[in-house]
Every structure is written in structure tokens, then in C-alpha cells.
């Protein structure tokens, strides 16, 4: 493929940025040379009840037999008071949450003082239900301000929140509740998303009807739509009734830096849910610091992260990072392309959004609809734009840059994981020139390496497995209740290294390009080929909206290349177009990457967060369609039936 264009740092950004290129180089070197001193200084960005000692800043070992990750270990603090109380004196009247409903006519605002009051009240509600420090509280909520209230209320009293994305099934709820032995669930009657209601309370009822769920005493229900829902007297409690007249005085619990803050279950494709455990001190320092520097956040800016609170992005970059920094956060209940693709631009203009953080899935969906939907979009307020969730293909990057950013907003293409707590590799807007499709360089204190299959570190411009050689404060501490699984999953593949599970290549400028999950590598005739590269080539064709590529058993090559292709709305599928796309990929990458089979797909199997579930695609491509496994986490399970019916590899 043609070498990507480099987009220099805009001078109007670098002139006023927190971090310019020289500062980045100096700080990064200091963070690697002496992490204890570096993080000892950075830890001061949040408030501590008992300050940590310099000798306790970093106590970490990546040895799978002696695995331990501790940061600021003797310090004490409270995450809720860092997100709320410390802003009250100077910024109590500042807007903390700007909320827009699925229907744009519904708007709410909460100042930091109002948010603080509600959090303290709800913390007292939880205490009255017998919730104490260390208890796990499950949240299954719509995207409303009360979701943030409930999270911060848990943190205030030292309870550990476990947020389940509002699209997950009763089975998913049950397995997570059982694993965390949760006594209390917080939910709503219904959620609203893209004009449809989501039966949250009904799903909770179904989950709790399973004989295996015996730990839950109470379900607190917020009225979102006012729908009639089944009510179990004694167990089910009304949010508004509980909040009426309750005291707003609730001192924050003193927590050790290594006390758990939250659990977040990753929806692994197989096996039991994996409870990723994050603790209080290191996580909060890292979330606040990455939010400030990666987005070059300035006081009084409006910041919009389109992620749902049920994902790590919602935790780190809609709640904890922004609120620790005293930001004004836009929260949107629905999806930013409903009722029309113009919605994203309308929200940006209506609320004068300065920083936008969204996912490639949404960008590609908007791209497929056509840029004419943004003809009336001003975008004057936008300064920084971000991308999260998966590698963004260069074509979508350029579209985002031109149509949404009007070619003047730097794009921070951020790479990180639920397990990392915060962003690990990303441009800093005032410091690092960007290349479409590259996450560029590591954040401070982050020590990436590329290794071969034996764990040998590769230098220079190479491709291989992405690992981290040292810890950072936001790193997960364990898999809840299963430390052996933590060691096995992340530290046993490559000795003394954290294995991300992703492949990457590093170019001659030292920039990192994420090539996708290592299990998304196809071995064609002995040559390794990243699926992301083939997908990017396909999507670069003007008639392709989205593509997913997997390997399938091939009699001659070992693995062949099977592409699922969604066309833009006015394109017609044909055999001629199929051949054109094969030649297109051949020209873009080389003969080796030519897809063997191209299946037209009206939709792809995605989770509700927009991640493509490739295990289904791999099985369909391999003609293994009798036992596909659980599809309850898919946004639209019917997509699977359509793909099976039109599969190309039937024997």
C-alpha cells in the first residue's frame, strides 16, 4: 500500500498544548529512566488523605510465579471526593453533566454541587440497604446521569461497583452477579436507545429467577420511562422514594490505594466471565492524567465521549478521568446516528463540544451514509477528536478528519484495553504528528515491545506480538477471585512481560500500528497477514462501507482469506464488483492478500458496543454452523442466520 501521509501537529494546537514535542521526549525518557520518581510526582495530581511514601510508589513484578502490581501502596484517598468534593469551593456551580436524551427534546444539567448532593444522598441510600465497604454492587443502567451518581456513590462508601452494559442478556447478568456475590442491583424500568425501549427491569427479573442466583437482597429501580414493570414487594425498591428526604451528608470513606474501586467483566468469547479488577489510587491517577494530556483538556471545555458507561471507556473517560479533572461531560442517552446520521453534528453544535471521543464503528457507519448529512454542520467548537475501541482504518481516519474535523482537529487514535485501565499508546495533540491508522507512540511510563513467537524482543521496523515490559498505575490487579487465571492469561505466554493479545508493527519512525488480535492473523501459505490490513484495503474502495476478514481452512494454502463485505447504501452487489474488489486488494497490498471468498453482508455480528464478534465469522467461513455458541451479547442476533444462509463455503 502507499505509505501513509503524515499530518503535522497544527501550530495553533502546539502553541497552547500542555505537552509539546520536546516536553514529550523529556517526560517520556524520565518516566522510563526513573518510574518511581516520575509517578511519585504525578501522583500529586489527585488529593490524598494519607500521602503515599516515595518508597511505596511502585512495587510491581511481572514474574508469573510471583505476580504483584501495587502503586502508591501506603497512600489513602477516596475516588468520589477526588471527582466531586475538591471542585466544590472553586467550581461548585460549574456544569458537571450536560445530558441529552435519545429524544433531543429531553435535556438535563447537573452542576458539580448538585452531582455531589445526589451522590451523597444515594450513598446514604446504599448504606441504609446494608451495603458496606468491600461489598460488590451491580449496576445495569441506561445512559442517564443516575448511572454516574450510582458509581460515585459506591466509590464514596468503599463499595465496589460492577457495571453491566444495558444490552446484555439475563444470562450475562446472572453469571456476573453470581461471580461477584452481589447483594444489591441498581437498574431502571427501561432504557431508551435509537427510539426503542430496552426492558432492563424485566431482564434483571429474569436473571434473578434463575435458581443459581441466591445472593441478591434488593433491586433499586429508577423510573426512566414510567413503564409498568413487575414488582416484588420487599425486594424491589423505588429510587425516587428512597432518595426522598435522605440526608446529603455522607463523609467519604478512607480507602487504601490498593482497595478495589470496580469490577468490569470482559465478554470473552468463551469460558466464564472474566472480572477485571481495578483499584483506587493508581487507576485514578492514570485516568486523570491520560484524560488531561491525551485530549489536551483545558478548563471550561465541553468533552463528549460517546461510549456507554458499561464499558471501560465509559468508566475511565466519561466518569473518573473527566470528573477528577473537573470537566464538563456531555452524556448522550442514545446513539449518535439516530434519528438521522446528522445527529452527531447537531449534538456537537448544540452543546459547543470541544473534544469528541468516539469509535471507528460509528465513523464507518456515518461514512456509509454519506457526507451530505453534515452539510449544515458547523463544527466550529471542535478542537480535538479521538478514536477508541479498535484500529481505525486510514480511509475512515481521513473521512473523520475532513468531514467532522474540517481538517483542523488533530485525531488521537488511542490504543488500550479494559485490562489497562487507561490509554497506553496514542498521539498527544500538541506533540506527535499523526499517520492515519497508527496509534503512534507510547504514553508516559508505558514500555511497549514487539516480540516474536519465542518472546525474543525485536528491534527497529518489525511486526510481531505487542507486549509491555513494565507496569503502569492504571493496570488491572487481578481477575476477581482467580489470580491464577490472571497470571495464565497475561503473563505466561512471554516470560516477564504483559501480553496484550494484540499484534503490532513498528515503522521506521518508531510509530506503532495495531494489526488486530493475534488470533486475527491469517497464515496464508506460510505468510502471516493481519486481518486489519486486508479490511483497511477493502474499506478504502468507494463502494465498501465495512469489511470483516477471517481465515478459513484452505486445501492448498492452509488458510484462505474470507471477506464479509457491507456495501455503501447506493452500491449494488454483483460478481463484477466482487472481482473488482479482489483486484483492488491485490493492488493495494499484494497478490498474497487477495481474498479467496467475498460474501456480501447486509450486517455484521456486533456486540452492542460495536465490536465485531469474529468467532462467529470464523465458524461460518469454516462451514461449522451447527454449534456457534452463545449469541446473547450481539446487538442483532438475526444477522447470524442471514450470514449462514448466504455463506460461500458450503460443502
Swiss-Prot record:
Keywords: Acetylation, ATP-binding, Ligase, Magnesium, Metal-binding, Nucleotide-binding. GO terms for biological process: acetyl-CoA biosynthetic process from acetate. Disulfide bonds: none annotated. ATP binds at residues 389-391, 413-418, 502, 517, 528. It catalyses: acetate + ATP + CoA = acetyl-CoA + AMP + diphosphate. Its EC number is 6.2.1.1. Its cofactor is Mg(2+). CoA binds at residues 193-196, 313, 337, 525, 586. PROSITE patterns: AMP_BINDING. Coiled coil: none annotated. Mg(2+) binds at residues 539, 541, 544. Gene3D superfamilies: 3.30.300.30, N-terminal domain of ligase-like (3.40.50.12780). Acetylated. Deacetylation by the SIR2-homolog deacetylase activates the enzyme. One of its GO terms (molecular function) is ATP binding. Belongs to the ATP-dependent AMP-binding enzyme family. Catalyzes the conversion of acetate into acetyl-CoA (AcCoA), an essential intermediate at the junction of anabolic and catabolic pathways. AcsA undergoes a two-step reaction. In the first half reaction, AcsA combines acetate with ATP to form acetyl-adenylate (AcAMP) intermediate. In the second half reaction, it can then transfer the acetyl group from AcAMP to the sulfhydryl group of CoA, forming the product AcCoA. This is Acetyl-coenzyme A synthetase. It comes from Shewanella denitrificans (strain OS217 / ATCC BAA-1090 / DSM 15013). The gene is acsA.
Amino acid at each position: 500500500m502507499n505509505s501513509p501521509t503524515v499530518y503535522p501537529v497544527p501550530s495553533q494546537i502546539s502553541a497552547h498544548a500542555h505537552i509539546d514535542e520536546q516536553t514529550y521526549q523529556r517526560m517520556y525518557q524520565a518516566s522510563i529512566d526513573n518510574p518511581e520518581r516520575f509517578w511519585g510526582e504525578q501522583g500529586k495530581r489527585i488529593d490524598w488523605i494519607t500521602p503515599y511514601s516515595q518508597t511505596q510508589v511502585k512495587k510491581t513484578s511481572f514474574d508469573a510465579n510471583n505476580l504483584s502490581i501495587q502503586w502508591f501502596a501506603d497512600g489513602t484517598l477516596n475516588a468520589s471526593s477526588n471527582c466531586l468534593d475538591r471542585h466544590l469551593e472553586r467550581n461548585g456551580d460549574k456544569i458537571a453533566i450536560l445530558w441529552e436524551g435519545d429524544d433531543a427534546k429531553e435535556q438535563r444539567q447537573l452542576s458539580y454541587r448538585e452531582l455531589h448532593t445526589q451522590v451523597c444522598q444515594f450513598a446514604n441510600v446504599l448504606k441504609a440497604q446494608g451495603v458496606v465497604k468491600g461489598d460488590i454492587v451491580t449496576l445495569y443502567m441506561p445512559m442517564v446521569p443516575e448511572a454516574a451518581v450510582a458509581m460515585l456513590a459506591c466509590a464514596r462508601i468503599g463499595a465496589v461497583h460492577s457495571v453491566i452494559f444495558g444490552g446484555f442478556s439475563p444470562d450475562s447478568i446472572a453469571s456476573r452477579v453470581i461471580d461477584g456475590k452481589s447483594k444489591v442491583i441498581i437498574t431502571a424500568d427501561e432504557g431508551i436507545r435509537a427510539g426503542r425501549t430496552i426492558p432492563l427491569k424485566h431482564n434483571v427479573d429474569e436473571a434473578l429467577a434463575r435458581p443459581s442466583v441466591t445472593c441478591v437482597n434488593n433491586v433499586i429501580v429508577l423510573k426512566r420511562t414510567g413503564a409498568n414493570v413487575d414488582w416484588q414487594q420487599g425486594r424491589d425498591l423505588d429510587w425516587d422514594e428512597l432518595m426522598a428526604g435522605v440526608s446529603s451528608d455522607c463523609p467519604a470513606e478512607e480507602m487504601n490505594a490498593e482497595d478495589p474501586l470496580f469490577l468490569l467483566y470482559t465478554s470473552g468469547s468463551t469460558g466464564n466471565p472474566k472480572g477485571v479488577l481495578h483499584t483506587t489510587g493508581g487507576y485514578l491517577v492514570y485516568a486523570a492524567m491520560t484524560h488531561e494530556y491525551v485530549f489536551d483538556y483545558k478548563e471550561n471545555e465541553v468533552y463528549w465521549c460517546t461510549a456507554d458507561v458499561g464499558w471501560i471507556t465509559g468508566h475511565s473517560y466519561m466518569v473518573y478521568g473527566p470528573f477528577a479533572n473537573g470537566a464538563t461531560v456531555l452524556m448522550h442517552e442514545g446513539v449518535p446516528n439516530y434519528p438521522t446520521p446528522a445527529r452527531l453534528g447537531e449534538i456537537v453544535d448544540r452543546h459547543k463540544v470541544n473534544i469528541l471521543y468516539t469509535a471507528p464503528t460509528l465513523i464507518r457507519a456515518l461514512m456509509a451514509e454519506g457526507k451530505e448529512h453534515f452539510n449544515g454542520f458547523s463544527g466550529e467548537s471542535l478542537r480535538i477528536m479521538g478514536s477508541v475501541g479498535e484500529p481505525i482504518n486510514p480511509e475512515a481516519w481521513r473521512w473523520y478528519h475532513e468531514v467532522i474535523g474540517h481538517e483542523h482537529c488533530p485525531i488521537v487514535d488511542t490504543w488500550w484495553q479494559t485490562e489497562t485501565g487507561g490509554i497506553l499508546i496514542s498521539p498527544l495533540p500538541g506533540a506527535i504528528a499523526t499517520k492515519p491508522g497508527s496509534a503512534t507512540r507510547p504514553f508516559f511510563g508505558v514500555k511497549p515491545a514487539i516480540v516474536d513467537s519465542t518472546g525474543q524482543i525485536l528491534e527497529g521496523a518489525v511486526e510481531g506480538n505487542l507486549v509491555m515490559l513494565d507496569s503502569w498505575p492504571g493496570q488491572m490487579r487481578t481477575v476477581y477471585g482467580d489470580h491464577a487465571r490472571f497470571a495464565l492469561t497475561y503473563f505466561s505466554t512471554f516470560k516477564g512481560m504483559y501480553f496484550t493479545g494484540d499484534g503490532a508493527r513498528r515503522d521506521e519512525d518508531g510509530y506503532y500500528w495495531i494489526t488486530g488480535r493475534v488470533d486475527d492473523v491469517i497464515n496464508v501459505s506460510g505468510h502471516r497477514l493481519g486481518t486489519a490490513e486486508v479490511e483497511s484495503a477493502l474499506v478504502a474502495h468507494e463502494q465498501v462501507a465495512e469489511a470483516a476478514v477471517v481465515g478459513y481452512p484452505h486445501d492448498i494454502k492452509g488458510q484462505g482469506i474470507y471477506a464479509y463485505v457491507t456495501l455503501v447504501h447506493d452500491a449494488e452487489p454483483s460478481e463484477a464488483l466482487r472481482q473488482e474488489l479482489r483486484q483492488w486488494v491485490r493492488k493495494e497490498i499484494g497478490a498474497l492478500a487477495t481474498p479467496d471468498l467475498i460474501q456480501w453482508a447486509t450486517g455484521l455480528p456486533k456486540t452492542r458496543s460495536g465490536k465485531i464478534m469474529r468467532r462467529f465469522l470464523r465458524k461460518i467461513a469454516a462451514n461449522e454452523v451447527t454449534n456457534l455458541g452463545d449469541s446473547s451479547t450481539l446487538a442483532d442476533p438475526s444477522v447470524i442466520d442471514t450470514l449462514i444462509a448466504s455463506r460461500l463455503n458450503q460443502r
